[in-house]
Amino acid sequence: MGLVWRSRTSLVGQLIGLVRLVASFAAQLFYRPSDAVAEEYHKWYYGNLVWTKTTYMGINCWKSVSDMWNYQEILSELQPSLVIEFGTRYGGSAVYFANIMRQIGQPFKVLTVDNSHKALDPRARREPDVLFVESSSTDPAIAEQIQRLKNEYPGKIFAILDSDHSMNHVLAEMKLLRPLLSAGDYLVVEDSNINGHPVLPGFGPGPYEAIEAYEDEFPNDYKHDAERENKFGWTSAPNGFLIRN
């Protein structure tokens, strides 16, 4: 009798497991959330300042966590020798990039530029593979420094723009990088989500509009990495994942 009971119990358990499996499959098959769901989450994440509460190794890192995951995947595939960051702030993202690059295991340097390092975390300053430069990112001297680093660390480049978000400044940054980036290099223009794309409507022309203006002038410079941009449903860099042609 005990053996029969255990057999029936086992069969019931298997049936319940099968029903759950079918229900799970059906949910995945028939539930197709609209883009509006992702947009609402985007607005929630931004509007509640979740991005300002994000840290890396205890250092503030004002980023979308899904974007950061995307960046490490890009770095792993691209295997650049030079990472360029315009906009240092606390230094968390620069340290993050350096740690990822060390795992890739080839000689590299991270150059991060900001017009003020007053907010820079002292722990970030101890990072040996990051070069912190206090300057406007559009100063011609920055282009000269990038060229020197290219000579010292030949190979692919990953660049990310996250400093002054005004259209004219971002456009100037993109133009400064134009002669420095080669085919296959990667550029991310962050915060193109502001000015109603979909957050902070009324901000005024910003990174999104800078990308459009750049592409009007130089339509063949970049192709858009739509797969990366859309991978996690939303990004702080819409229209801003760019691969140099």
From Swiss-Prot:
InterPro entries: RhmsylMtase, RNMT_CmcI, SAM-dependent_MTases_sf. Pfam families: RMNT_CmcI. GO terms for biological process: chondroitin sulfate proteoglycan biosynthetic process; DIM/DIP cell wall layer assembly; lipid biosynthetic process; methylation. It comes from the Bacteria. GO terms for cellular component: plasma membrane. Was identified as a high-confidence drug target. This is Rhamnosyl O-methyltransferase. It comes from Mycobacterium tuberculosis (strain ATCC 25618 / H37Rv).
